[in-house]
């Protein structure tokens, strides 16, 4: 029986349209193989939306996304729009999309692929077998807390203020996502906070600990954020799933990403309690290589696989895509960002063709 899904495509800026085209071709192939019908709707976001409509997130785009089963995003931003005020820049489109879809959980995997292990800056024995999922709270914490701003005191001195705030319900909902994620993986969850200094972290630790009683099959541990950062570099294989707040997650997810050696290989997902999630590569829009057929489409393709797994409940189709990625790497196919001696240098389109062949053979 054919299953039908409505997918909003947001190619965005820079290399976005190129890598999105590869991901769509891959989805069409697995759709045929698994009797899945995709209804793709393309919409504007970021710089492309600014050029066309004057705003980074047109209301029509948000409406289209809300009516979808999932949103696949490519890349946002570029030098062209850097002179705009911060609230008018392309990146504001992503923030607006997250808020409009009420997405509060960001899932960032960091997995060492055997074929690329030497790309890591750490020793092989340290990173071999690393497979981490960072679950970051996305809409609370110090980035959104109030009061905030730069004020002038009675003495005329400038004073900058930001406020880290979390409510019990905000902690509980991200905690549930993290426990459920850990349950589907290796059953280990590490909660990262700064409870030895911050009151908000004491509440965080208390709520996560209480929530763990509902998940007796998941092993819970706690680390202070400074120790967690050190342990990610010293012994990353100890981690399975990490859950943490917005600020700490912003930092730790990038640190975990660089264990892999190439940010161009990493997908991500942003999820809410209901409604469509947004799936996108971690890397930026790379305007310097846009249109030159040099982009690495693999993170975009792996983001499509995450979409199949987490939004559409199609784990077998997701597995098929992930295995195809491993296969093309195993046969030595590389784009410039992951190229090494003796490998086959391919452009974006040719890498897509190689993926299609791998999917059709398997």
From Swiss-Prot:
Alphabetized UniProt keyword annotations: Amino-acid biosynthesis, Branched-chain amino acid biosynthesis, Cytoplasm, Leucine biosynthesis, Magnesium, Manganese, Metal-binding, NAD, Oxidoreductase
Residues that hold NAD(+) according to the record: 78-91, 284-296
One Gene Ontology term, aspect cellular component: cytosol
Gene3D superfamilies for the chain: Isopropylmalate Dehydrogenase
Cofactor binding, note field: Binds 1 Mg(2+) or Mn(2+) ion per subunit.
Main subcellular location: cytoplasm
Pathway(s) where this gene product acts: Amino-acid biosynthesis; L-leucine biosynthesis; L-leucine from 3-methyl-2-oxobutanoate: step 3/4
Cofactor needs: Mg(2+); Mn(2+)
Pfam families named in the record: Iso_dh
Annotated residues for binding of Mg(2+): 226, 250, 254
InterPro entries on file: IsoCit/isopropylmalate_DH_CS, IsoPropMal-DH-like_dom, Isopropylmalate_DH
Entry EC number(s): 1.1.1.85
Reaction catalysed by this enzyme: (2R,3S)-3-isopropylmalate + NAD(+) = 4-methyl-2-oxopentanoate + CO2 + NADH
Subcellular location(s) per record: Cytoplasm
Site (Important for catalysis): 143, 194
Residues the record lists as binding substrate: 98, 108, 136, 226
GO biological process: L-leucine biosynthetic process
Molecular function via GO: 3-isopropylmalate dehydrogenase activity; magnesium ion binding; NAD binding
Functional description taken from the UniProt entry: Catalyzes the oxidation of 3-carboxy-2-hydroxy-4-methylpentanoate (3-isopropylmalate) to 3-carboxy-4-methyl-2-oxopentanoate. The product decarboxylates to 4-methyl-2 oxopentanoate.
Subunit and partners: Homodimer.
Family: Belongs to the isocitrate and isopropylmalate dehydrogenases family. LeuB type 1 subfamily.
Protein name: 3-isopropylmalate dehydrogenase
